[in-house]
Swiss-Prot record:
Pfam families: PCMT
Active site positions, chain numbering: 133
Similarity section: Belongs to the methyltransferase superfamily. L-isoaspartyl/D-aspartyl protein methyltransferase family.
Gene behind the chain: pcm
Subcellular locations according to the entry: Cytoplasm
InterPro entries documented for this protein: PCMT, SAM-dependent_MTases_sf
UniProt keyword list: Cytoplasm, Methyltransferase, S-adenosyl-L-methionine, Transferase
Name of the protein in its database record: Protein-L-isoaspartate O-methyltransferase
Length: 297
């Protein structure tokens, strides 16, 4: 990997961003797994405050156009809009999520040689044996985090485990007031910073560290999303989830001993924190993610 030029200090600033009018109300998503708790109540109480996602959307939309000017078909609004339309047709109903997918220029987060595939619903390699997730998976997981929120209410504070190239973090910044993202692979952390720099996302903080430990200094989080699959969800992350908050993660499914097949598969797991000691778990569809690992490299 070639040396990278000096970069501005991260985390990125949260202020000095011009706002625009709030996005149109989305249609209702899937029913909430449990009743809204304190995390959602806190979000509703702040509805009338300036919205960081709207500020981020203004910043990202304007800078995406500038960063991709003259870039041809893959740089056009039409390519992003067409992707959002396909996701809507496939079952994604959260208009806020669809608008975010239609705003973030995915081709800026992939290798130039793969730019022609950036707006296909496909996972693509980003180096270091990691991938950028399929847009449909990104949209589905974020939509699950937003269940139970009103149409114009952002998620309060999100923790992402596995920044990768930074694409999902950029999408999250348009649906949440604050986003904290952790990456354990130093070159990917630097790559994400470089990818996000042209967009100057105001409500996103990137951290280099062990994602399995979470980010206790910024906890609690109203939502946590994992971009890698472990045998189970790390206890540290459960402890950092706010009461009433949601965590979405791919987890391994090991077949019972003595069964006909011993292939380990993965499925999405939605966890809601009901109170200090109780969690509600819902197993969802099959997925395939890179493995969740501890430590930093």
């Amino acid at each position: 990997m070639s040396p990278t030029p000096p970069r501005s200090k991260f985390p990125l600033p949260l202020d000095a961003v011009v706002q625009r009018k709030p996005a149109p109300a989305r249609t209702a998503g899937m029913p909430a797994v449990g009743a809204p708790g304190p995390a959602q109540a806190q979000a509703k109480a702040r509805d009338k405050q300036p919205s960081a996602p709207t500020a981020a959307a203004s910043a990202v939309e304007a800078r995406a156009s500038a960063a991709t000017a003259g870039g041809g078909g893959m740089a056009s609004d039409r390519a992003r809009g067409a992707l959002a339309a396909r996701l809507r047709a496939s079952g994604i109903r959260d208009e806020r999520v669809l608008a975010a997918i239609g705003t973030v220029p995915r081709h800026l987060f992939v290798e130039p040689g793969l730019a022609s595939q950036a707006y296909e619903d496909a996972a693509l390699p980003i180096g270091h044996q990691q991938t950028i997730s399929k847009p449909s998976v990104v949209a589905r997981m974020i939509e699950l985090l937003r269940e139970g929120l009103s149409a114009d209410t952002p998620v309060e504070r999100v923790l992402e485990i596995g920044t990768g190239c930074g694409y999902q973090a950029a999408v999250l910044s348009l649906v949440a007031r604050e986003v904290f993202s952790i990456e354990r692979i130093r070159p990917l952390h630097e790559q994400a910073k470089a990818n996000l720099r042209p967009l100057r996302v105001p409500n996103l903080r990137l951290h280099y560290g062990d994602g399995m430990l979470g980010l206790p200094q910024a906890a609690p989080f109203s939502a946590i999303i994992l971009a890698a699959a472990g045998m189970e969800v790390p206890q540290a992350l459960l402890e950092q989830l706010a009461i009433g908050g949601r965590l979405i993660a791919p987890v391994a499914v090991v077949p019972p001993a003595g069964g006909s097949g011993q292939t380990v598969t993965q499925q999405l797991l939605l966890i809601e924190r009901l109170n200090r000691h109780r969690f509600h778990r819902t197993a969802l569809e099959a997925v395939f993610f890179v493995p969740l690992k501890s430590g930093t490299i």
